[in-house]
Amino acid sequence: MNNPAMTIKGEQAKKQLIAAALAQFGEYGMNATTREIAAQAGQNIAAITYYFGSKEDLYLACAQWIADFIGEQFRPHAEEAERLFAQPQPDRAAIRELILRACRNMIKLLTQDDTVNLSKFISREQLSPTAAYHLVHEQVISPLHSHLTRLIAAWTGCDANDTRMILHTHALIGEILAFRLGKETILLRTGWTAFDEEKTELINQTVTCHIDLILQGLSQRSL
């Protein structure tokens, strides 16, 4: 029989190792050492082998953690999108609201300091993809990208399978990602010191304005 106290202790150790590994892998990629990861986690280096196996296995465990985290954050949006798509004629106001909510959620996540290591990890994988990226892509990025494409296509009357529609969706997502990947630029240009609640709301308003322009523009012209 499992000892509940030992099980809780083990889960805590795994969480600490994942958090430390995300920070180290995000900063150094696979050049990160298990010794530094264990030290940052406050764990014995043998704990990595015990809980995960090799360094490569720990790297994939980080990717799975990211997939689970993103999936949890956006699952309500995906489920609501499916309910909308199941309707014979989805309400356009509801479609727009769901697009805005998904984008607001992305902005919220990408302006928080505690998701920086996640962003670093994914950015490395975007530029030099490994099996870890494909894991995250298949489980959450591709489904969420597809849902947003379908929502935009449904509102504008465009074909969701058209490559140009996918590109328009990707460009919109890129506009939001710019506030994470280009964070230092916008802080210096605006004179801000950080993304607090007030600044994040201003970003939300700006992106909402752009989304409405994009939706109106695409609905009034061919792709």
From Swiss-Prot:
Please summarize what the entry says happens upon disruption of the gene.
Mutant shows increased sensitivity to chloramphenicol and cefoperazone, a third-generation cephalosporin.
**Where is each HTH tetR-type domain found?**
11-70
GO CC terms in record: cytoplasm
Gene Ontology biological process terms, A to Z? DNA-templated transcription; negative regulation of DNA-templated transcription initiation; positive regulation of DNA-templated transcription initiation; regulation of DNA-templated transcription
Q: Which UniProt keywords apply?
A: Activator, Cytoplasm, DNA-binding, Repressor, Transcription, Transcription regulation
Q: What induces it?
A: Negatively autoregulated.
Q: Does the keyword Nucleus apply?
A: no
One Pfam family for this entry, by name? TetR_N
GO-annotated molecular function: DNA-binding transcription factor activity; identical protein binding; transcription cis-regulatory region binding
- InterPro entries cross-referenced by the UniProt entry: DNA-bd_HTH_TetR-type_CS, Homeodomain-like_sf, HTH-type_TetR-like_transc_reg, HTH_TetR, Tet_transcr_reg_TetR-rel_C_sf, Tscrpt_reg_YbiH_C
Question: Where found, per UniProt?
Answer: Cytoplasm
Give the annotated DNA-binding region, as residue ranges.
Answer: 33-52
What is the documented function of this protein?
Answer: Regulates transcription of the cecR-ybhGFSR operon and the rhlE gene, which altogether are involved in the control of sensitivity to cefoperazone and chloramphenicol. Represses the cecR-ybhGFSR operon and activates the rhlE operon. Acts by binding to a palindromic sequence within the intergenic spacer located between these two divergently transcribed operons.
Name of the protein in its database record: HTH-type transcriptional dual regulator CecR
What gene name is given for the protein in this entry?
cecR
